[in-house]
A protein has these predicted regions:
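Short secondary-structure boundary/capping segments
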Residues: 253-254, 287-292, 350-353, 359, ...
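Short, surface-exposed ligand-recognition loops at beta-strand->loop->(often short) alpha-helix junctions
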Residues: 71-84, 175-187
Length: 511
């Protein structure tokens, strides 16, 4: 019988060394790295400078506390110490004034109490440990939260002017500081609500998560805006954002063509909830794909063009755009959640949808339909570009809803509409101007951008490049946005030459 050589039908047998748990002597690994080096000299003069700032807080804020025993204070760190690894957690601890949040780069907020400020001054004066000295060297200023800071640099007059009109005033959005679990948070919220009631400022927190401490506040005049800006509990006050559909660049119509209807016997199909302006009921073929409707817009304010266009793409995308690659040809139904009223004067009466109203409508529908439908399309947004430092309130609330109801929101990256439109690659100036708009910064949402399906030789994107109107990331904390891109129409950067994708409206085919 011939002997098999190595590599001719049998594998080489290699020795195995078995290491059992706890086998052998454990050796302590010596720590590495050098002692923390301070960013500046922390001498007596510098310590006294910080002590004076804390004393100013004690004298200006603490005596004015009514009904509460704590106040937020702003801490600015130097630019070199903006990284989280330099965060002064030991200096601002539970024993002194704990950190309760952060804002822009190098901006922290701490909870100040009379006892905590006294402890903080003692630490600043006398503590010589390497850790404390390093953290003291990070501090630029310790200061009060000002009304201007709460208004994000806007004047009270400008804020009132930008706020949408309500029943008896103008609707603003107010966020409170979050002191964390305990009596202090309940106390500042109760004191805030009490003072607003005394001044006749109507509050409404419906639509916002309870622990977000967010309110719609209706202000009748500049004096009430100013009063809110001075309340200790308030972290920010802004105009209430308006929600709009992401309106297509062109809607040239053509006569209807025959499109496939849904087989009545085929009930086992995926369904997308279209959260939009409504889906037309006048086309029998499209109506066959609509599995249900929840219409929350009054008849005089209905304009279903945008919602119908979106639904047509979901149901018949490959049929109306046969030359576009990568389109799913399987059947898909839609559920019509009509929440966005008409905002085009050429189409009839107009009204606005507030951010708070959208959130209320969404949660109401989710309570009923979330177990059945898991993908919800939101081709809507605001005109507010996302910050690189913090997430938009709308994105935070949408993430809360997605987590609570275990659904996924598909969200538009937003459209840039001011000519000249965006180049690719983006110019340095366009990186800020063309950033995604809220709520495209949703972490759990799937943010979608548009690619060009045509090739512009000049003054426009090349094929497969981002469309000139499609906004880009990054989002807050440099998260990657958009999450997904697909063909969504194209145009030249001067807005003259348009090449859309095809779908339908009530009037017929549209591009």
């Amino acid at each position: 019988m011939p002997t098999l050589r190595k590599g001719e039908g049998m594998q080489e047998r290699l020795p195995i060394k078995l290491i059992m748990p706890k086998q052998g002597a454990e050796r302590k690994v010596p720590g590495g790295g050098s002692p923390a080096r301070p960013f500046r000299d922390v001498d007596e003069k510098y310590r006294q400078h910080l002590v004076n700032q804390v004393t100013a807080i004690e004298e200006s804020i603490i005596p004015g506390l009514k009904g509460v025993q704590a106040a937020p204070v702003r801490v600015k760190t130097i630019a070199k110490a903006a990284a989280k690894s330099h965060r002064p957690d030991t200096l601002f601890s539970e024993q002194s004034c704990p950190i309760i949040g952060s804002g822009s780069l190098g901006e922290l907020f701490i909870k100040a109490t009379p006892e905590g400020l006294s402890t903080l001054k003692a630490v600043i004066k006398t503590n010589d440990s390497e850790r404390i000295v390093k953290e003291l060297s990070c501090i630029e200023t310790i200061e009060a939260v000002t009304p201007t800071l709460r208004r994000r640099g806007s004047s009270a007059e400008e804020l009132l002017r930008r706020s949408p009109r309500g029943e008896s005033g103008f609707i603003t959005r107010v966020n409170l500081f979050d002191f964390g679990p305990g009596e202090d948070q309940s106390a500042i919220a109760a004191e805030f609500e009490k003072r607003c009631k005394e001044k006749g400022i109507r509050l409404d927190s419906r639509g916002y998560a309870a622990q977000s401490w967010t309110y719609a506040a209706e202000c009748r005049n500049v004096a009430e805006i100013d009063a809110l800006s001075k309340m200790i509990a308030v972290r920010s006050i802004s105009h209430m954002p308006l929600i709009r559909t992401i309106r297509p660049k062109s809607l040239d119509t053509a006569p209807f063509i025959d499109l496939p209807s849904r087989d009545p016997g085929n009930s086992d199909i995926p369904v997308v909830v279209v959260v939009d302006s409504g889906i037309s009921a006048h086309d029998p073929a499209l109506n066959s794909w609509v599995v249900g409707r929840d219409q929350q817009v009054a008849k005089p304010y209905q304009n279903t063009d945008h919602g119908t266009f979106v639904a047509g793409l979901i149901c018949w995308g490959p049929d109306m755009n046969p030359t576009l690659p990568g389109l799913e040809s399987g059947p898909c139904g839609v559920f019509d959640l009509q929440v966005i009223p008409n905002d085009d004067p050429a189409k009839g009466e107009t009204t606005a949808l507030l951010e708070q109203e959208l959130l209320m409508s969404l949660e109401s529908a989710l309570e009923t339909h979330a177990n059945k439908y898991k993908v919800w399309n939101l081709s809507l947004g605001t005109d507010v570009p996302c910050s690189l430092d913090e997430f938009s309130e709308l994105a935070v609330q949408l993430d809360n809803l997605q987590e609570k109801y275990q659904v996924s929101f598909v969200i538009s990256a937003g459209n840039y509409v001011t000519p000249p439109l965006l180049d690719f690659p983006r110019t340095p100036a366009q990186l800020d101007l063309g950033r995604i708009t809220a709520p495209a910064d949703s972490v759990l949402g799937i943010t979608v951008g548009a690619l060009s399906h045509v090739d512009f030789k000049t003054k426009g994107p090349r094929q497969h490049h981002p469309s000139a109107f499609s906004r880009h990331g990054a989002g807050p904390n440099h998260i990657i946005k958009p999450d997904l891109v697909h063909y969504g129409g194209s145009c030249s950067t001067d807005g003259v030459h348009l090449h859309g994708i095809r779908s339908i409206t009530e009037a017929g085919l549209a591009e």
